[in-house]
């Protein structure tokens, strides 16, 4: 019988290790006991997945292959050591080798009671659903006063103690035999037919149709129309394919889409129950063969792109347009990164188009205030542009009936919008050369994307929260998936290679020069890519709370439990890669919060997300508290100062301007209590717990400001609609981490710059992995302009210099 024995401490001197070594010798005729140490297992950190580390994979493999497991634990503060707890966290996070595995607990400690309380706690952990070990009931071996229990040879001195240990161990051997019989695969049969079930997806109900024969799951059809395009698409192919291939429900959830993944698995399980089958039998079956591929692979290409979001895919498409080979490596199962989670609004001044639209009330006043800015407060490198802008606006104000814009207005707003001072008194603003490239070439990015296949809606000029001006170009297809779908299609049609589930870990260096990258595949296999150039486009670190806290110099506090709008993939990998070869960092202390995020999930597209000109924000007293047209950090700080939670108030007309929803979704959210609706403002106030008279007064005042085109309370930058037509809505909102402005230092050609100021040969970067453009605060809509503009530039420079 093959047993794994785990020393439950990383201490160099341990009586639990001595106990297991004694058991290995004493029971050598009964079992082959392999003792494993946990010293090299990292502390568990959910935001930095290290499941693929050899130390963790070694435990996963050996435990999976063993007949049973013994854990020897000491007792620290009435519980198990943190190092042992970390191991169990890793072994129940992405891999689950202890599921159903027969397990025996032993323990040694200095105290007379042995490790009784630690063993009790350990048993509770092992019984948890994510671990689900088959712990032997009853018999526990507790070795008290362990420092007196062994002789110099490491043998137990007391015959009675040895007898008790033998009794426990022999019971465990019998327990292993019985428990493993229960783990043997069972046959399952179904009542053949087609079964309709409804399960829960990320965005709501997920209808499914499952077809079963008497012995097999034959077909799985999913109505995914209610889910966000791009984010969960991989779920609707991978999960059903692996279920059908292996005839198993032992399928891993897709990273970044675990709610929808588990919804699909639950839906199939419900269908199996309806057909008279037992889904638990299928949960114990092996994974599908395709899910177990561990073969190392090696590739060669001209340019390798690290990251499959908007910046990475734009760079890849541009490499292909230059006639070169490209590979995109994306660590998550699906492409898209933060781009697919964005609102799809791309800032670019397009005056000829914009002037065909009328100005909104307050916009001319906004420009008048801007050009009155004291020139002494403008940085020297921006001053000439500011003076030219003053002349442009002065001429415009002679007839301010239409929507004005220019590259220079965009540049100055990006500069002023990003100009911030941190808690240490350090003032930052965007690098002029980088901001100039952004605002001069962003319209080229719009035209380039249209040529790639993105269909833009030219019927209106859009504006996201914190943008400061209406200049956003919006695809007809909702949100950011339009960009990802078009670029993905272009890359695949033009023979580009995309590998998902491929996390880059290191550069390949030859004589100090970058010659490609090393990566880990889905099952820990090594992926080697030789290339002439590397483009880092892996995003920022908005989903890595510890890293945010480490670098933060702007916010007074970043809470451990803060929500994020980001993909879980956005954890700073590319920044750390750059640091590993001496890349300089810039602006790392500044992160941005999205003020209008879901209080429970951090999502930005629940409730009613409308243009800022239609924002009416009220606090928990029913009062407005900020200029809703302001920058994101201004809105977030104001919200935090007002308790965090606030409400966006809308009426039927404002609801029609929402860019993120449908009537069906609205009904579901109202029913779920995550969106409030009422026929009167008084009734709405009661639902959200504010004084009705206060809310009515607030809205009446706001409506009068819309009529006047001026807000005497908060000087709102622009207005559109009044709040006057029932039904009325309240969307709960709370700030969540959204964007990190800092990252790798680059120049205007997207070279990554070393700490000594020199370029790193063959290394380029684009998008949120870089810093220097947005400084202390990013304008809404500038992220997409950034990634598509500098993604193209990075590719062009890489091809010109290296290929």
UniProtKB/Swiss-Prot annotation:
It is an enzyme of class 1 (oxidoreductase). Binds 1 FAD per subunit. The modification FMN phosphoryl serine is found at residue 258. GO terms for cellular component: membrane. Keywords: FAD, Flavoprotein, FMN, Oxidoreductase, Phosphoprotein. It comes from the Bacteria. Its EC number is 1.3.99.33. FAD binds at residues 311, 330, 338-339, 343-344, 573, 739, 768, 783-784. The keyword Zinc-finger does not apply. GO terms for molecular function: FMN binding; steroid dehydrogenase activity, acting on the CH-CH group of donors. SUPFAM superfamilies: FAD/NAD(P)-binding domain, Flavoproteins, Succinate dehydrogenase/fumarate reductase flavoprotein, catalytic domain. It catalyses: dihydrourocanate + A = urocanate + AH2. Pfam families: FAD_binding_2, FMN_bind, FMN_red. The active site is at 632 (proton donor). Its cofactor is FAD; FMN. S.mutans strain UA159 is significantly more abundant in subjects with type 2 diabetes (T2D) compared with subjects with normal glucose tolerance (NGT). Catalyzes the two-electron reduction of urocanate to dihydrourocanate (also named imidazole propionate or deamino-histidine). Dihydrourocanate is present at higher concentrations in subjects with type 2 diabetes, and directly impairs glucose tolerance and insulin signaling at the level of insulin receptor substrate (IRS) through activation of p38 gamma (MAPK12)-p62-mTORC1. Therefore, the UrdA enzyme from the gut bacteria S.mutans strain UA159 may contribute to the pathogenesis of type 2 diabetes by producing the microbial metabolite dihydrourocanate. Belongs to the FAD-dependent oxidoreductase 2 family. FRD/SDH subfamily. NCBIfam families: flavo_cyto_c (TIGR01813). PANTHER family: FAD-DEPENDENT OXIDOREDUCTASE 2 FAD BINDING DOMAIN-CONTAINING PROTEIN, FUMARATE REDUCTASE. This is Urocanate reductase. The gene is urdA.
